[in-house]
């Protein structure tokens, strides 16, 4: 598990497979974009000045193991790595995202396979046939207080 707080410069290499949890914002400031293009073939806009203004160079990126059964709580979200079976309940007041890491979940006539995600609404409880290894991400509403 690698936690990269906002304001930290970062990049992904070609072929990287990541499970990214983003904050509830549509703001992205780009220093460089490898000449990528949008859906119209136009190079995506860079935001060098604004990126420098919001950069937090003293922040530390943390890297830890994230083994089965572990839970990590941060200001922005909680993330759990577990095996789900029988029932799955979201006790939070916000929706959670359940992503299947290994295995297959069957629920209410739907199937969710490895690499797929479902949205579990606040206080929703679903019945599950089978079991699967999953990551459950729940955002925290930290900006309203």
For the regions a language model picked out, list residue spans one by one:
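Short gly/pro-enriched beta-turn/loop segments at secondary-structure junctions
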Residues: 4-5, 13-16, 72-77, 93
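Conserved beta-strand segments that form the floor/walls of ligand-binding pockets within enzyme
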Residues: 3, 20, 99
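Ligand-binding loop in jelly-roll beta-barrel domains
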Residues: 6-27, 122-144
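Glycine-rich, charged/polar anion/phosphate-binding loops
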Residues: 4-8, 66-68
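Conserved active-site loop/cleft motifs that coordinate metal ions or position small ligands
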Residues: 95-101, 115-121, 134-138
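Glycine- and acidic-residue-biased ligand/ion/polar-headgroup-sensing regions
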Residues: 84-110, 114
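C-terminal amphipathic alpha-helical segment
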Residues: 27-87, 91-92
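Short acidic-glycine-tyrosine-enriched beta hairpin
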Residues: 1-3, 106-127
